[in-house]
């Protein structure tokens, strides 16, 4: 679809959506997004130009179906997949991608760290994906020197970053906000640094006694990104990994740097979103969202969860979806899903499904709470189907039709029960929705009360 769109742009010094928007140009991607989001083209262009919306759309990802991340668009969900040195292969990752797209992932991140040819799995994922693909390039940078922090140099980082752009990666998590002066702030934490990328950069700075190379070479990265229209996802290396560490000095110091980097990227006309926590008590979520908007000039916020309690391993898709719904309500643009395997192991395809459905619920609930036009239409349609005992319509409108039908059919499997005016919860005689109050019923009741000298029915 996009091959003809991007053909004329290739070779230009800057092909970013932000660059075109600031020139007053509505690209085909902006037009496509406007139709998907039911927004005016002019508003999409203005939001992209302002930096409040991004359209991650690498010119080399030609089978991409463009989408938007920003406060003016619907709340989005990202799904993480990826192979590790201990598990998975290319076929398994493609199966996860297929499931992620099927169950509504708006973007997918390939977080592969080893165990496969990283270029092979990434290229396969990009070629198969209609949604934007994100990566964390420091993983492959370290893998390229066989895990040796000592041998890892600045050029290794930039080489891998450009390779990902060439392959068609739409956004990259760049951990440029972690500075050497932030490291002492970590000492008082309960769980230290929990970001893998942040941990790699911290080790690099401690060994080489030099500033974070992703910070010192940030302008060089911007020059790379604008040639491909790759977007920044500014990584939060110091995100809290437990309730105890939420909103601490380390997290907020890095956030301030991320705000400065946002402006530097914008100066190059490069698109930016900013990553956020993590593990945050419910009473601190609004503060975290507002603080990011303030420090980062309303660049789209992209949060992992946040988890609102730390005591439920195996159920962290639930503990985090609670926080995600709240974060989305307060203005977060994209939610990174958490699966039941979080903190325990690499997710399998069923974990991907469970995590995604939990987060589609959270994002949809946020859109309703934000009074996004049309957000509740599907809810109302399903409710009408429920009231009319239209079981097949209910299944069709569900976020997970297969699960809804499976649960219904466990007790009432025969097709005849798809026309029944009850389910197995209440049975045929006790379903309250069988009580239909008509105008004739109310007229008769009104007359009866009047004849008995009783008070009128309330309006």
UniProtKB/Swiss-Prot annotation:
Zn(2+) binds at residues 279, 343. Substrate binds at residues 80, 109, 139, 175, 195-197, 236-239, 275, 302. It catalyses: 5-amino-1-(5-phospho-beta-D-ribosyl)imidazole + S-adenosyl-L-methionine = 4-amino-2-methyl-5-(phosphooxymethyl)pyrimidine + CO + 5'-deoxyadenosine + formate + L-methionine + 3 H(+). Its cofactor is [4Fe-4S] cluster. InterPro entries: ThiC (IPR037509), ThiC/Bza_core_dom (IPR038521), ThiC/BzaA/B (IPR002817). Disulfide bonds: none annotated. Pfam families: ThiC_Rad_SAM. Belongs to the ThiC family. [4Fe-4S] cluster binds at residues 423, 426, 431. Keywords: 4Fe-4S, Iron, Iron-sulfur, Lyase, Metal-binding, S-adenosyl-L-methionine, Thiamine biosynthesis, Zinc. Signal peptide: none annotated. This is Phosphomethylpyrimidine synthase. Catalyzes the synthesis of the hydroxymethylpyrimidine phosphate (HMP-P) moiety of thiamine from aminoimidazole ribotide (AIR) in a radical S-adenosyl-L-methionine (SAM)-dependent reaction. GO terms for biological process: thiamine biosynthetic process; thiamine diphosphate biosynthetic process. GO terms for molecular function: 4 iron, 4 sulfur cluster binding; carbon-carbon lyase activity; zinc ion binding. It comes from Prochlorococcus marinus (strain MIT 9313). Pathway: Cofactor biosynthesis; thiamine diphosphate biosynthesis.
